């Protein structure tokens, strides 16, 4: 039995509260277990220099943690005057992941800024950020469509992420909390689309190796968990989720034509 009495293939309790903040085009408070992240999506009517004049948009992300999101206070990176390598890695991961499920030509020369602020951390902050950021992005695109900023729905699949690992006593487990992550022999972050395709795999052995069969086992756990997370996204988005399904079907028909 796991520390919190979950089954090996069981996610922590999930809550997705949409429109959590007043000002952003899209905002979400997502809670997975004791990990809580505020995710926002903001539109800016310009793009990075390398995209100017091409008629397409861009998605980029920033990620941070409140000083007391963790058990011991961490100094703000703005106070240090330097963004850590970990933060840079996570920001790039979030941006890459979201760009995989959107047609950037359909948003015009605009940048969508994704901000993920961890207000409480208990493992899985990057995967929770990606899962929440997708919902915030969808809300922002719905608002942009409604006010005429964009003419066509751009998101063509769902996107979510989860952690999996191998515990020395329990074997393969899904959605690790911080304490489980600290003692895991193997841990992996998996980002997948609604079609079940991989966007990113980040896996390492912690003073241990893992076999091909173990890899298949934890990937199967991730697949199960991400399907459940996408259902939670659907529930949170309501009718907006239908737009994603319609765009996915249209893209499929175009690829088969």
Swiss-Prot record:
Organism: Halalkalibacterium halodurans (strain ATCC BAA-125 / DSM 18197 / FERM 7344 / JCM 9153 / C-125) (Bacillus halodurans)
Listed name of the protein: Ribonuclease PH
Job of this protein: Phosphorolytic 3'-5' exoribonuclease that plays an important role in tRNA 3'-end maturation. Removes nucleotide residues following the 3'-CCA terminus of tRNAs; can also add nucleotides to the ends of RNA molecules by using nucleoside diphosphates as substrates, but this may not be physiologically important. Probably plays a role in initiation of 16S rRNA degradation (leading to ribosome degradation) during starvation.
Complex and partners: Homohexameric ring arranged as a trimer of dimers.
Coiled coil: none
PROSITE patterns xrefs: RIBONUCLEASE_PH
Keyword Repeat: no
GO molecular function (one): 3'-5'-RNA exonuclease activity
InterPro entries: ExoRNase_PH_dom1 (IPR001247), ExoRNase_PH_dom2 (IPR015847), ExoRNase_PH_dom2_sf (IPR036345), PNPase/RNase_PH_dom_sf (IPR027408), Ribosomal_Su5_D2-typ_SF (IPR020568), RNase_PH (IPR050080), RNase_PH_bac-type (IPR002381), RNase_PH_CS (IPR018336)
Binding locations of phosphate: 86, 124-126
Keyword match Phosphoprotein: no
Keywords annotated in UniProt: Nucleotidyltransferase, RNA-binding, rRNA processing, Transferase, tRNA processing, tRNA-binding
Enzyme Commission number, as recorded: 2.7.7.56
Family designation: Belongs to the RNase PH family.
Catalytic activity reported: tRNA(n+1) + phosphate = tRNA(n) + a ribonucleoside 5'-diphosphate
GO biological process, one term: tRNA processing
Highest taxon listed in the record's lineage: Bacteria
